[in-house]
C-alpha cells in the first residue's frame, strides 16, 4: 500500500511539474526559433540594403502610384543608392559598403530608418538588421531617433489610411509627408557624419554638401521622386567621385555638358549655404513664395527643366523668380 501511494505521489508530481514547466520551456523554444528564422539583412552589404528598398517599394503600392507602382516616390531613394554605388561613392569592397563612406552613412538614414518604421507599422516583413559597433547606426526601432522615426511613421500611416479607406490617394499630400521625413533623416545624418564628410576630397565634399542642401530646395516644391523622374536625373549626375583637381567642372573632359552643369550648380549651392544668413534668407523666401500656387508651379517647372536638362544658372533663375516674378 505504501509503495503504491509513493508511486501515485511521484506520478502526480511529474504531471504537475510537466504542466507548470513544460509550457514555459516550449514557449522559450518557440521564441528562440522565431528569432532564428527571422530573415537577416546586413545593411553594409550593398545587395542587402538594395533588397530592403525593393521590399519597401513593393509593400507600399497604392492606386495613386499606378498599376506598375512606378509613381511610388520611394523609387528615388533606391535609384540614388544605385547611382552612389555605380559612381564609386559607396567605396564598396567585396560587396560591402564602406562604413566610412559619407554617402553610405547618409543613405543609412534614408534606407534602414524608413524600413524600421514601415516594419513597426506592419507594412513590410519583420527582419533582423545586423548591427555594428557604432551607436549612430541603430538597428531596431527602439534604438533609433524617435523624432526621425515619427516623421516616417506619419508618412507610412498615410499609406495605411489610403488602403483602409479604399481611396486612390493624393500624391501631393503623400509627397509632403515623404519630404518631411526625408529632410528629417538628412538633417539628423548631416549632424552625425561630419567626420566622414571631411574624409572626402575637397571637391567631392563641395559637391556632396551642395547636394544635401539642394534636397531642401526640391523638397520645398514637393518634387516627385518617382521612378521615371529620378532615373532620368541619374543620367545627369557625375559618374565618378570628384577629386582635388576638379575645381572647375568645365575642365572635366570625361563628363557630359549636363553632368558638368550639375556639378557646377552643387558647387554654387555649397558656397551659398556656407553663409547661414544668406542661405536661410533664400530658403525662407523660397518657402514663402511656394505658398502661392502660381509661384510654386513656376519654380517647380524650372527645377524640372533643370533636372531634365541641367543648366549652370538654376540658382540665378530661382533668385530672379523670387525677386521679380512672384
UniProtKB/Swiss-Prot annotation:
<dbReference type="InterPro" id="IPR008499">
    <property type="entry name" value="Leg1"/>
</dbReference>
<keyword id="KW-0325">Glycoprotein</keyword>
<feature type="glycosylation site" description="N-linked (GlcNAc...) asparagine">
    <location>
        <position position="226"/>
    </location>
</feature>
<feature type="signal peptide">
    <location>
        <begin position="1"/>
        <end position="22"/>
    </location>
</feature>
<feature type="glycosylation site" description="N-linked (GlcNAc...) asparagine">
    <location>
        <position position="85"/>
    </location>
</feature>
<protein>
    <recommendedName>
        <fullName>Protein LEG1 homolog</fullName>
    </recommendedName>
</protein>
<dbReference type="Pfam" id="PF05612">
    <property type="entry name" value="Leg1"/>
</dbReference>
<keyword id="KW-0964">Secreted</keyword>
<feature type="glycosylation site" description="N-linked (GlcNAc...) asparagine">
    <location>
        <position position="165"/>
    </location>
</feature>
<feature type="glycosylation site" description="N-linked (GlcNAc...) asparagine">
    <location>
        <position position="58"/>
    </location>
</feature>
<feature type="glycosylation site" description="N-linked (GlcNAc...) asparagine">
    <location>
        <position position="245"/>
    </location>
</feature>
<comment type="similarity">
    <text>Belongs to the LEG1 family.</text>
</comment>
<dbReference type="GO" id="GO:0005615">
    <property type="term" value="C:extracellular space"/>
</dbReference>
<keyword id="KW-0732">Signal</keyword>
Amino acid at each position: 500500500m505504501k509503495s503504491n501511494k509513493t508511486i501515485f505521489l511521484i506520478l502526480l508530481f511529474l504531471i504537475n511539474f510537466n504542466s507548470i514547466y513544460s509550457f514555459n520551456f516550449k514557449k522559450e523554444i518557440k521564441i528562440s526559433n522565431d528569432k532564428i528564422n527571422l530573415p537577416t539583412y546586413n545593411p553594409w552589404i550593398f545587395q542587402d540594403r538594395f533588397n530592403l528598398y525593393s521590399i519597401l517599394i513593393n509593400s507600399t503600392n497604392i492606386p495613386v502610384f499606378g498599376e506598375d507602382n512606378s509613381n511610388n516616390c520611394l523609387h528615388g531613394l533606391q535609384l540614388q543608392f544605385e547611382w552612389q554605388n555605380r559612381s564609386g561613392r559607396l567605396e564598396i569592397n567585396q560587396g560591402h559598403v564602406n562604413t566610412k563612406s559619407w554617402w553610405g552613412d547618409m543613405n543609412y538614414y534614408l534606407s534602414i530608418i524608413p524600413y524600421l518604421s514601415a516594419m513597426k507599422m506592419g507594412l513590410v516583413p519583420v527582419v533582423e538588421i545586423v548591427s555594428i559597433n557604432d551607436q549612430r547606426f541603430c538597428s531596431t526601432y527602439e534604438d533609433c531617433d524617435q523624432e526621425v522615426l515619427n516623421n516616417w511613421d506619419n508618412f507610412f500611416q498615410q499609406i495605411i489610411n489610403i488602403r483602409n479607406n479604399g481611396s486612390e490617394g493624393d500624391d501631393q499630400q503623400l509627397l509632403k509627408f515623404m519630404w518631411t521625413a526625408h529632410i528629417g533623416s538628412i538633417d539628423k545624418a548631416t549632424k552625425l557624419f561630419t567626420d566622414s564628410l571631411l574624409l572626402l576630397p575637397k571637391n567631392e565634399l563641395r559637391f556632396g554638401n551642395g547636394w544635401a542642401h539642394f534636397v531642401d530646395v526640391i523638397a520645398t516644391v514637393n518634387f516627385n521622386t518617382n521612378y521615371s523622374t529620378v532615373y532620368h536625373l541619374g543620367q545627369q549626375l557625375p559618374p565618378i567621385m570628384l577629386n582635388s583637381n576638379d575645381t572647375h567642372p568645365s575642365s572635366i573632359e570625361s563628363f557630359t555638358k549636363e553632368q558638368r552643369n550639375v556639378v557646377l550648380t552643387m558647387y554654387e549651392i555649397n558656397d551659398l549655404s556656407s553663409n547661414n544668413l544668406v542661405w536661410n534668407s533664400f530658403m525662407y523666401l523660397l518657402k514663402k513664395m511656394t505658398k502661392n500656387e502660381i509661384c510654386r508651379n513656376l519654380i517647380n517647372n524650372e527645377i524640372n527643366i533643370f533636372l531634365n536638362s541641367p543648366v549652370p544658372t538654376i540658382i540665378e533663375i530661382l533668385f530672379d523668380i523670387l525677386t521679380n516674378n512672384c
